[in-house]
Amino acid sequence: MNRRQVLTGLAALPLLQAKPDPAAADRSSSIDFDPWMVRKLARELASKPYEAPDSSLPASLNDLSYDAYRSLRFRPERALWRAENLPFQVQFFHRGFLYKNRVTIFEVADGKARHVPYRADDFSFGDVAPPPDSDLGFAGFRIHAPLQRADYYDEVSAFLGAAYFRAVTKGERYGLSARGLSIDTGQSSGEEFPLFKTFWLERPAPGASSMVVHALLDSKSVAGAYRFTIRPGDTTVFDVEMALYPRVDLQHAGLAPMTSMFLFGPNDPADTPDFRAAVHDSDGLAIFNGSGEELWRPLCNPKDLQISSFGDRNPRGFGLMQRERSFANYQDLESRYELRPSLWAEPIGDWTDGAVKLIEIPTREEVHDNIASFWEPKQPLRAKGEHIYTYRLHWGPDTPKPKGLARFVRTGVSARGDNDRLFVLDLAGDRLKTVDAAAVRGVVTADKGEIRNIVTQPNPAMGGWRLSFDLAQARAPVELRAVVCEGDAAVSEVWLYRWTP
């Protein structure tokens, strides 16, 4: 079972009950629409008690296997806007398997919202026989646009399951996912999974380079309104505007959340023999903090749940990155991990005090997402209030931030006895090409144990530099910090790492 099936086929929520209720309108008619309407609906929804979902389906769809569900395919020739030859097309996901919740979808054109009707003959069902004349509804949708070439509509984004969505860019494959909101992620009380329950898809103009999606979110603790402006390209960009209306105080709200997978890599090798040297959708967390400091934290597959917190004020950006881009370091012809996108979240406006959180969960299989990252405000999001945030998501091979400093591109760890470790860090970047080699030095600190044998030297095999050091007498989890300097001036980002025996 795929990890995204596990994570996204979760909480299913009821259809919108607020009045006016566009989902309850005559489905052959249209209603007036403006973007503020979604906020009004979310605010009204939050003022009412939460209602548990009704996700009932006929047995033929409720009990599907993963492979059987995959046979439920939307017919591409029936795609929304295909006949109009517009720059975007939309195909829909059928309900079934883990995706039992119905989402209501509207098309918006000329200020009017028209319900997109479910028609069974829009799908091919394989061996699954749907009940005749049933309005079974949709589980989600995917967006297609010319990405690789002008005469073919590639899949560029998908919204399916809970509040999950993902995207790709030119030359890449799906990898990590984003979410509309996370609640209590990593908390002992258990996580709550909000759900996008209604979508409004704005019809793009001929020649448009972007598409707008509005969404209504609901869960036990909060309702919310979202506006996504989606621009596919060499980097696929989502401009996200969200307004949250909590029913209760949200102590642990995760903003701009993202989830990924890290099974093993050079810093955290596989426990059992594997023909691949690395298996991961992301290999590190990058942070550009409010003080202008650039941080890099390689990911791990820990023995126990790990939660890391990077306190900040008005962060400039953070994201789960896939820096290793060489097939030779993965050797997986099927998964092609070197083609998985990175995801960078760029806050816009004042996000005040809080922390970038990193959650690392033990896993034995690559089919499970075990990495999560998000921004958690220091102050709770209070009930009965309106909390507005704007940010930009960049899906692509790299971050959009300047590359003035050298970057750590590989972290290797070797055992030296029971409690000692050798760390070997490789760096790359144009900044290293102009340094005075005699003045280059590594600065390494640890909150426990002892740092020995710090060596900084050119790495001609990769056109960069290498920093190595020993961590000695370390018997407890150790927080490490390293930076490469030319004299007293940093020429690299800051490398952070938690070593656990």
Curated annotation (Swiss-Prot):
| Keywords per UniProt | Periplasm, Signal
Main location (coarse class)? periplasm
Q: Which organism is it from?
A: Rhodopseudomonas palustris (strain ATCC BAA-98 / CGA009)
What the entry lists under Gene3D superfamilies is as follows: 2.70.98.10, Immunoglobulins (2.60.40.10)
**What Gene Ontology terms describe what this protein does at the molecular function level?**
carbohydrate binding; catalytic activity
* Signal sequence, start to end: 1-25
Identify the metabolic or biological route this protein is part of: Glycan metabolism; osmoregulated periplasmic glucan (OPG) biosynthesis
The protein, known as: Glucans biosynthesis protein G
Family of the protein in this entry: Belongs to the OpgD/OpgG family.
Subcellular location per the Swiss-Prot or TrEMBL entry: Periplasm
A Gene Ontology annotation in the biological process aspect, one of them, is: beta-glucan biosynthetic process
Gene (name only): opgG
InterPro entries annotated for this entry?
A: Gal_mutarotase_sf_dom, GH-type_carb-bd, Glucan_biosyn_MdoG/MdoD, Glucan_biosyn_MdoG_C, Ig-like_fold, Ig_E-set, MdoG_OpgG
Looking at the keywords, is Signal present? yes
| Protein role | Involved in the biosynthesis of osmoregulated periplasmic glucans (OPGs).
GO CC aspect terms:
outer membrane-bounded periplasmic space
